[in-house]
């Protein structure tokens, strides 16, 4: 699943995950 590592998408996903987890 790491054929095309989109750092932008990954960063946004991580940020959203942390945001939701922090809530």
From Swiss-Prot:
GO biological process annotation, one example: pyrroloquinoline quinone biosynthetic process
Cross-link Pyrroloquinoline quinone (Glu-Tyr) mapped to chain: 15-19
Please give the pathway this protein is involved in: Cofactor biosynthesis; pyrroloquinoline quinone biosynthesis
Instruction: Supply the Pfam families for this chain.
Output: PqqA
Keywords noted in UniProt: PQQ biosynthesis
State the family it belongs to: Belongs to the PqqA family.
This chain's function reads: Required for coenzyme pyrroloquinoline quinone (PQQ) biosynthesis. PQQ is probably formed by cross-linking a specific glutamate to a specific tyrosine residue and excising these residues from the peptide.
What protein name does the entry list? Coenzyme PQQ synthesis protein A
Q: Which organism is it from?
A: Stutzerimonas stutzeri
Q: What broad taxonomic lineage does this protein's source fall under?
A: Bacteria, Pseudomonadati, Pseudomonadota, Gammaproteobacteria, Pseudomonadales
Name the gene that codes for it: pqqA
């Amino acid at each position: 699943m790491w054929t095309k590592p989109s750092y932008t998408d990954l960063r946004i996903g991580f940020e959203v995950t942390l945001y939701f987890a922090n809530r």
